[in-house]
Amino acid sequence: MPKISLLVAVYNTAAYLPQCLDSLLSQTLKDIEVLCVDDASTDKSLDILHQYAEKDERVKVFALKENRGQAHARNVGLSHATGDYIGFVDSDDWLSRDALEKVCESFRDDVDSVLFRVLYAYPDGRMRDYEMSPFTTMTGDEAFRASLTWQIHGCYVVRNSIHKAHPYDESQRAYSDDNTTRIHYYYSRKVAYCEGVYYYRQQPVSTTHNISVRRFDFLLANESMRRQLLSLGASEETLRCFETVRWLNLVGLYMFYYLHRHELSLTDRQHGLSVMHHVWQTIHLQQVSPSIKRKFGYMPLRCSWSLFRLQEEVYFWLRGVVGRNR
């Protein structure tokens, strides 16, 4: 049984895949398995995976016949994972040579999840640390709360038992894997930080940066997260915390709509408004922080969707006047 199983979901990343796989197979910790799931790539990615599998038995390749999204691909790999601990590496990212060794050193006592040190890697060669307050360990509940607004990141390794009990959320093709990260932190007794580096390649056309109707999936993924919290019997305090974050995210997505609606098709604009209207109608306002709800731009105005939209239009117009819509 390997010490660590790494899930690598692959879709059309042939240009970066060798760097990713080379970084995994050259780890100072040799006792690993690399579970690569090709999500119906149309480039040479699958050929590259087979080449690596032929050279190193630690690489296992699974090919999907149709594109199902990252969460599904990772779940396919997860179903075959046998390591004591399980993590993921995106197929265009890579690890420092000692990253997994440092992760293993941090799994002690009642630590159930270990975060990497994340460095953003830019096309011009610049590197920048993910900004978060330093810590050695925190409780799972503290980590869960910090992850709601990404005060801590989601690049980590977790105990097999937790990951197998809580596979990736496939409710949306984008963003819903964030829910799984939060659930893993929620169920961890302790979450630790290590200095092993995860290099996170910055792509200007990634889902998180792209001007696309898929950005509104973020709100639907949030809704799925709430359903999971309810099914897990989360405390009222946790639900209040998350519902406040959901409300802030709704206003944040309205800002995206305000700034970029002319770059979206009519159909996409209508879809975005429909999703936001649904969240506005169904969010549990009694669980949203009162201090947030009293602020102009954040007042629910549940009596009228049109009035709420007017508030948002005026709010973001005023922000634009003073140069704050960035």
Give names to the regions the model predicted.
Residues S96-E170:
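Flexible acidic/His/Gly-enriched loops in nucleotide-sugar-dependent glycosyltransferase catalytic domains
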Residues G196-Q203, N210-E237, L248-I283:
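Catalytic core of nucleotide-sugar-dependent glycosyltransferases
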Residues H262-R326:
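Membrane-interface aromatic/basic loop that binds lipid-linked glycans or pyrophosphate carriers
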Residues D38-D47, E66:
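A conserved acidic beta->alpha catalytic loop
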Residues N12-S26:
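Short, well-formed alpha-helical segments that are part of the catalytic scaffolds
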Residues P2-I4, L25-C36, K44, D56-K60:
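Short loop->beta transition adjacent to catalytic acidic/histidine clusters or analogous donor-positioning motifs
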Residues G140-F218:
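Conserved nucleotide-sugar donor-binding catalytic segment
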Residues L64-A81, F88:
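Glycine-rich, basic loop-to-helix element that forms the pyrophosphate-binding segment
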